[in-house]
Amino acid sequence: NTVYSSTGNNYQAAVVTAQNILREYPYTKRREDLSILILRAKYDMAKESVPEKKEDRMRETIDEYYAFINEFPESKYKSEVERIFKDASKFVKDEEN
């Protein structure tokens, strides 16, 4: 959570920082926490995006959800990631109609 907080509203920097940590330390005990941070940051960035980029970023959030839930099917964050997935999916579905 420190990485996320220290970057303020710069969601992309939070994503890149967390991804770099995971790349450098793939077996860290904090892997799940860093992964939820990436998902949250992508979701928050998508929500605050300009309309032209919002749908693509929601789709990226959905992709990140699948990666997360595949790696951590019994995550302590499961209800949160399910809520994010539902919201992002609803947005994409509404955009398609």
Residue spans of the language-model regions?
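Acidic, polar-rich low-complexity tracts and alpha-helical solenoid repeat scaffolds
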Residues: 1-97
